[in-house]
Every structure is written in C-alpha cells, then in structure tokens.
Amino acid sequence: MANHANAMNKVKILVVGDSGVGKSSLVHLICHGQCLSNSSWTIGCSVEVRVHEYREGTPSQRPYFVELWDVGGSNSHKNARHVFYNPVHGIILVHDLTNRKSQQNLRRWLSEILLREGGGTKSRIPLVDDFDAEQFGGFSQLPVFVVGTKQEQVAEFRTSGRVRSSSIADECAADEITVNTLDQRSLAPGSSNAVRLSRFFDKVIERQQTTTSRTDGGFSYLERENPMFRRNKATSSFVVTG
C-alpha cells in the first residue's frame, strides 16, 4: 500500500521546445525560485523535482512530487529522445518570444510526443508540420501549458506590459504565461504567473489520478488518449481506428 501511495504521489511533466529558448532556466526558476546563473545546453534530458501542494487551502490538500523533464532540443538527438516520453502526465511547451520560429515549431514538438510516445519503431514516423489539435481525439484532456521566455526583450511588453497569446495556446485551449527567467519575480509566489502554473499542476495531478484508475487495455497512455492511433502489437506499426 505504501509503495502504491508513493507512486500516486508524483507526476511527470515534459518540458519541450527548441534549443536555446530557456527551458533549463525556466525549470530551475520553477523548482528553486531562483535564476540560473550559468545555463548550458541540455544533452539528452535533465530532471528536476518540485514539491507542489495539490489543491492548496482545501481539505483535499496534499503534497505531490512534480517531476519536470527538461528534454534537450537539439536536432541531433531527435531520433533518440522519444525514450523520455513514456509515460507523460502533462506538457509544458516553451518558446522564445523573440524567435517566432520557435513558437511555430511547438506544433512539431506536440506531434513528436503524440506519435513517438512509447518508443520502438514509432520513432520512424515522420513529424507532422501542420498539427491540428482537433484531429487528436482526447488530446485536449492531456494538460498543456505554454510559456514564452525572454519577455524583457519584447518591445510590445515594454510598452504595454502584455504580450498577445500564441496561436498554439489557443488551438490547444492551453493556459499561457510569459516570463523573464532572469528575474525571479516572474514566478513570485502569489503572482498571476505562479497562480496559473499552480492550477496547471493541479490539472496534471487530476488527470494522472483519472488515468491511473483505468485499465490500460494493452495500449500506451497516449494511444489510449488518442484512439485514432492504435499500435499493431505484432508489427509495432500504427493503424488508424474508427
């Protein structure tokens, strides 16, 4: 019973985006409340853990370990990084507000996670450039959070104090924040950004509680969430159902 409780008291969130957008700095700020002084390129994957109080301030409050899996964005490792994708309970998509291409590439990151989760020969499936969230049945049930970094370098923010939401956030019905990872006030306790992030963590935990209470039916997590994709167990290939 104790082992089962420990397994239930943690969730895994993928933090993905192009190289150089500031994923490692963001994860460090989330987990430690401090700015990362010396950032370096992530090779493979780096994992940091934050203790999150689920449903804080309510009778249901309880601590959860939130594992943030910072996946390296280098194209040279794109054929191997799918090993980090199974299982997944939530996704944080990170883009550089000064680099529009990094925002556009978030669609490729989503399709990579959805199509490659679970490993095997699925890694040979080509990425989907024109990702459409509506075509993935049940995808909206997998919590997604979008973060735009380098807020301080955006002229729109300097003049109005706001940055318009990204199209990918709208398409996925995901919440979104913009941050300056060089300023710890970006995620200061009680701030709007911190509250939104906390709500996202709660959603991830609630989703994990729901999915772990179901039988898997022989399919991986994202195959269950996206019934249009079903893996042929004999050939390890995907077939479309329904």
Please place each PLM-identified region on the residue numbering:
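Intrinsically disordered, low-complexity regulatory segments enriched in Ser/Pro/Gln/Gly
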Residues: T210-R224
